[in-house]
Amino acid sequence: MAAVVFIAFLYLGVASGVPVLDSSLDAEWQDWKIKYNKSYSLKEEKLKRVVWEEKLKMIKLHNRENSLGKNGFTMKMNEFGDQTDEEFRKMMIEISVWTHREGKSIMKREAGSILPKFVDWRKKGYVTPVRRQGDCDACWAFAVTGAIEAQAIWQTGKLTPLSVQNLVDCSKPQGNNGCLGGDTYNAFQYVLHNGGLESEATYPYEGKDGPCRYNPKNSKAEITGFVSLPQSEDILMAAVATIGPITAGIDASHESFKNYKGGIYHEPNCSSDTVTHGVLVVGYGFKGIETDGNHYWLIKNSWGKRWGIRGYMKLAKDKNNHCGIASYAHYPTI
């Protein structure tokens, strides 16, 4: 009850134009602003400070509970600490899994097949460095380029960063909305029918919408099709083990996801029916001894290296398709 009253007073202060601030957090607030290069007008700073303080208290409470074994992951204050819920939602896409469409074919796992217990495609050199999408909602494009980059190695023998901006600018005829969001399915359709995709070197990321400037002479990767996986973690596991990194959609609309630091992420309110964010599944494994409850998917995000485990997350695996990890998964064929 005390926490509810405290938060109520915070918002009452905002409504009256006089935010109630905790002076003991002044130094921490200043350090955070410097670290993430934040600057505000005087009025805006007070409003953002209230949001930041609320997030900080929530994070500290969660981490105290983690130390008591009440949850399996930790959180930290990051660049999103001053974001309101409305601002955070603008970073999210929203795709109902019932719109899941088939690509070239459907993959099936062979009965009795034995898969490795640990997979990490980063260690094999199939994953480019973590990047930061910024204010452009291009998660879907980062996920798709990551999957194509990995598959292209089988042809070229080298890892070439591909152009996210090429997808942002040019896949609108397929139904994407550039920096306002997109769909990995539509992005694969663009690459397939366009006949190729440029590299990051010739078509660098700008983090904003622009005119399509694709030059076929600079194409570095082509695909022959793409595969949509059934909504099965078992089949997703087989694909990650035998094919390579796989694009996936997940429900990332929660404060716990936004502020994730480390450990195996499990959010009780996560949906498996609606996905809001595109990621790349680059592996899987388990923590400690192999027992129920400690298996994870290793996913690559596009929020920079300061988020999560240097840009990655361990998401709970074999927990009823947690956060929809297997609901909207695809991979390209080369």
From Swiss-Prot:
Write the record's keywords in alphabetical order, separated by commas.
Disulfide bond, Glycoprotein, Hydrolase, Lysosome, Protease, Signal, Thiol protease, Zymogen
EC numbers on record: 3.4.22.-
Cross-referenced PANTHER family, in alphabetical order?
Answer: CYSTEINE PROTEASE FAMILY C1-RELATED (PTHR12411)
- What is the organism of origin for this protein? Mus musculus
Query: Could you tell me in which tissues this protein is expressed?
Result: Placenta.
Family annotation (InterPro entries): Papain-like_cys_pep_sf, Pept_asp_AS, Pept_his_AS, Peptidase_C1A, Peptidase_C1A_C, Peptidase_C1A_papain-like, Prot_inhib_I29
Which GO BP terms sit in this record?
Answer: protein catabolic process; proteolysis
**Residue ranges listed under propeptide:** 18-114
The catalytic site is made up of: C139, H277, N301
* EC class name: hydrolase
Name of the molecule in the record: Cathepsin R
Source superkingdom: Eukaryota
Q: Which GO terms describe its cellular component?
A: lysosome
Give the disulfide map.
C136-C179, C170-C212, C270-C323
Location relative to the cell: Lysosome
**Molecular function as annotated in GO:** cysteine-type peptidase activity
SUPFAM superfamilies, alphabetically? Cysteine proteinases
Which residues bear sugar attachments? N269
UniProt similarity note: Belongs to the peptidase C1 family.
Identify the main location: other
Where does the record locate the signal sequence feature? 1-17
Write down a Pfam family by its short name.
Answer: Inhibitor_I29
